[in-house]
Amino acid sequence: MKKLFNLLKKGSKSSLIAAIVNFLLGSLKFLAYLFTGNVAMFAEMMHSFGDAANQLFVWVGSAVSRKAPNEKFPFGYGRLVNIVCLFAVIIVAILAYETILEGIHHIQHPSNADQNFNHFLINAGVLLIGIIMETFVLYKAGKEVLEEAHLPTTGLHPLTTSFANMNKAKPATKLVFLEDTVATSGGVIALIAIIISRLTGFGQIEGIVSVIIGLMMFYVVARVFLENAAGAIGVSDDEMELKASRIILENQYISDIKRLIVVKEGVDLHLEAIVETPHHDYSLRQLAEIKKDIATRLLQEPHVVDVNIEFMEEDTTQDWVDGKGSSIYKPYDTKGV
């Protein structure tokens, strides 16, 4: 039990916080929906419970993915977090569908605008509490995004610059950030809809907002699914590949890179390179020293956990060009050292 607890502590903190907050908000919105029957509140309730469920899955998955490699899984459990995220978005997709369906039904068969002032206060109050709490979670997730991107996290940066650096975050952090962006904006839209419905009597707006929130949820589903499907298969990291190539070519004993691949395993990066040396008379000891020097520098980079380097004799052809992407499909002569 202690071993399991220590493992769970390694999980994404933003996912755990988001799961707890969304469960509390979902329960609050459920009570508000029972009292008022408001459709926009129903959409928000479904969204909160969906977020709570999949963020709980993501928290557990991100923790288990940190397990050390073993004989059965020599490359570790890194891709497990991608698989968990794929499972999580299925839940979001189902809830998004139900939200849109309920919204369309309300548009086609609008009920009379609720003139009960107490109901209005309940709905507005619950949504306002939700916006405040979701903004707090969004701020925490944005801060985690910036920490993983090695950027300043002070002031309003988590709510501003985090959007531009979202792709540098871990899959679990990115999922929480995206979902809470939708949750916060959805809460604002739902609050506006309830106010408009109260002031104008236009009850259909609640159904329209329900559809909008459902479509926003589907956007999260599509984006998270595509990114994590690529991660589960094994996607290259072009930014790290470019950085690694410059580190390798800074070594005075390396003249060219024949092949370089950086593959993501969850948050971990595995690097494989075939490099050219200008002379063929290096001893095994010298090659081992060169390899050790390059590998040591590469392993200092964030998330790089494994480096494999092979040597070839220089072939007088310049193969590596910065920014050309992974060289995995480039043909190369197999005569190596």
Where are these regions (language model features)?
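Topogenic membrane-insertion module of multi-pass membrane proteins
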Residues: M1-L28
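Cytosolic juxtamembrane amphipathic/interface segments immediately preceding
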Residues: K2-N6, K10, K72-L80, M166-A172
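Alpha-helical transmembrane segments of integral membrane proteins, especially early/N-terminal helices
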Residues: L7-I17, M45-F57, I83-T99
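Acidic (Asp/Glu-rich) catalytic motifs at the cytosolic membrane interface
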Residues: V21, F30, L34-K67, I104, ...
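Alpha-helical transmembrane segments and their helix-start/interface "positive-inside/aromatic belt" motifs
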Residues: F35-M45, G76-F87
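Aspartate-rich (DDxxD/NDxxD/DxxxD) Mg2+/diphosphate-binding motifs
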Residues: S62-R79, H109-A113
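Alpha-helical transmembrane segments and adjacent TM-loop junctions that form the membrane-embedded core
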Residues: V81-V337
